[in-house]
Amino acid sequence: MAFQKVVKGTILMGGGALATVLGLSQFAHYRRKQVSLAYVEAATCFSEPVNREPPSREAQLMTLQNTSEFDILVIGGGATGCGCALDAVTRGLKTALVERNDFASGTSSRSTKLIHGGVRYLQKAITNLDVEQYRMVKEALHERANLLEIAPHLSAPLPIMLPLYKWWQLPYYWVGIKMYDLVAGSHCLKSSYVLSKSRALEHFPMLQKDKLVGAIVYYDGQHNDARMNLAIALTAARYGAATANYMEVVSLLKKTDPETGKERVSGARCKDVLTGHEFNVRAKCVINATGPFTDSVRKMDDNDVVPICQPSAGVHIVMPGYYSPENMGLLDPATSDGRVIFFLPWEKMTIAGTTDSPTDVTHHPIPSEDDINFILNEVRNYLSCDVEVRRGDVLAAWSGIRPLVTDPKSANTQSISRNHVVEVSDSGLITIAGGKWTTYRSMAEDTVNKAVKLHNLNAGPSRTVGLFLQGGKDWSPTLYIRLVQDYGLESEVAQHLAKTYGDKAFDVAKMASVTGKRWPVVGVRLVSEFPYIEAEVKYGIKEYACTAVDMISRRTRLAFLNVQAAEEALPKIVELMGRELNWSELRKQEELETATRFLYYEMGYKSRTEQLTDSTEISLLPPDIDRYKKRFHMFDEDEKGFITIVDVQRVLESINVQMDEDTLHEILCEVDLNKNGQVELHEFLQLMSAVHTGRVSGSRLAILMKTAEENLDRRVPIPVDRSCGGL
């Protein structure tokens, strides 16, 4: 053991010395660049956008169809694809982008929500003396600073705690984290620091206390990934790019080069998924930025091409916010099987993940129960035994497919690259693959540089460093106060709008419906527990939302926060969208069914029915069954064998509890398995059994019944002498 520590110490010091030398050697170079990414003056940008608002989808389709030839056509509407479109259009190139599904519908909306340089990559760079890993971390840290600056409403620094349970880990990880700060240089968000055991438990009281020796806190960035992706797409559209979601590339167009006699890619045959209409989009250069689907587009160009994408599934789960501090995350650097697990606060909930396992490429990745349970077990290992971590506490879960790649130029074709690869085919198709969210901008710059050089396009240098994304330019931390004062919004709703839409929050507020209450004046919520309002559905359509799934998962983030709340909001969302888009009753029903399937399969939603009926037996002891029957019969006064909303209202009125009818309907619907408007005794017992075993985290009806029982039991008869003699 002592020998291992000495070896580790030697490697650490040697690697640290190397990284220090490399960092110092690069310092002068970055000083000469005269661009500080952390403090860019984006207000002095080269020009204002062409459009104050993004053109409608219909207008974009007309531009795609009627333009004789674009300079660049980008296939793929994820972060990298939209980044390429923004980079190209701001250089003065005539740019188009098509996406088969919605913007950020794939990997870009299913991330860990971190903007990070990669602490674990730096660890590998030091221990393996890997210069490539070091450069990748350095680039990511500079891009992190830029992203935090250009979209301040969607991103923010986040302190992350690294709890330590062995004394030798303290100096080991402290040096490593300090190297992380050093590599960031002037773009370091805040300096890392050490916490004692007591201070660590103050910040994170649920931590496993036994053998805890202390903790190290470092800083990375966090963002709303789908909204960030959308902001990039909308910014590109405002600068003049013809961007369209739900446009599938059916085939690539080719023409013969008169000079070489070779076939060259010259555009794509595109199909509007919503209408079935097809037309050609011609371009001098076509960029393949399709993430996990990289090889499918490459095979359109050349069916014999060797695949380069090595897809890997990363599963995340969302748990209630009380599982983590409001403004501090946690990193487990070495799980039971050697992976890294993050435990992060996000949108007042807690994200835990991720896994890393080989997978097949699919449009509809499903989080497996094994991966969900793996994450739950790792969470249990790090939290105090006082905290019961239950499967029923998983409010949402998703799987994202990482597009890891092998470099086709590398002699070792089996080596997986965590960096990005820009490949050019014989026909001129440019493919950008790999990389990560944080470095989308530099990946896009490299790709467009390659396109300009290869196709001799007339373009200036990249201008996306410091270029504010939609909503970021006039945002300030106090913007929400004006929303409260000027429009009469709830403070929570106003804060949500400000950090979601930035300076465009005023446009959303103008669409907000009057509540009919004294306060708030405007802003009718979609569901009571979350600050999303009806006006966001109307505004989401202006942001190219075409389906109910777009709205619950990427315009709002309800599906990623609580699938049950998303399901509750669906009928209202479909009705609002139907009114704006003139949907027929049949289309509304189709949207409702499609969105429900999406929640059920892709967002880890075991429906309430399935949760309650996993076992045909009710696993309760006889005394418990008797107690729950007593509660049930207290509501079922007429001994009908079921309870209705009228029964619940009657009991609540008797104990002076006021609750509106809509909320009561929601509460009963949670338990009404056969959806007949009645909660029967066996349904209630199944619910209580599921709560008891932890398959569901709780029930509003169960809590309501318990409260009523306790209040009624506390009542005592009024003595005769206090009741005027009983007259």
Swiss-Prot record:
Pfam families: DAO (PF01266), DAO_C (PF16901), EF-hand_7 (PF13499). FAD binds at residues 71-99. Calcium-binding enhance the activity of the enzyme. It catalyses: a quinone + sn-glycerol 3-phosphate = dihydroxyacetone phosphate + a quinol. Residues 623-658, 659-694 form the EF-hand domain. Ca(2+) binds at residues 672, 674, 676, 678, 683. One of its GO terms (molecular function) is calcium ion binding. Residues 1-42 form a transit peptide. One of its GO terms (cellular component) is mitochondrion. PROSITE patterns: EF_HAND_1 (PS00018), EF_HAND_2 (PS50222), FAD_G3PDH_1 (PS00977), FAD_G3PDH_2 (PS00978). The modification Phosphotyrosine is found at residue 601. Its cofactor is FAD. InterPro entries: DAO_C, DAO_C_sf, EF-hand-dom_pair, EF_Hand_1_Ca_BS, EF_hand_dom, FAD-dep_OxRdtase, FAD/NAD-bd_sf, G3P_DH_FAD-dep. CDD domains: EFh. Its EC number is 1.1.5.3. It is found in: Mitochondrion. Pathway: Polyol metabolism; glycerol degradation via glycerol kinase pathway; glycerone phosphate from sn-glycerol 3-phosphate (anaerobic route): step 1/1. One of its GO terms (biological process) is gluconeogenesis. Keywords: Calcium, FAD, Flavoprotein, Metal-binding, Mitochondrion, Oxidoreductase, Phosphoprotein, Repeat, Transit peptide. Calcium-responsive mitochondrial glycerol-3-phosphate dehydrogenase which seems to be a key component of the pancreatic beta-cell glucose-sensing device. Belongs to the FAD-dependent glycerol-3-phosphate dehydrogenase family. This is Glycerol-3-phosphate dehydrogenase, mitochondrial. It comes from Rattus norvegicus (Rat). The gene is Gpd2.
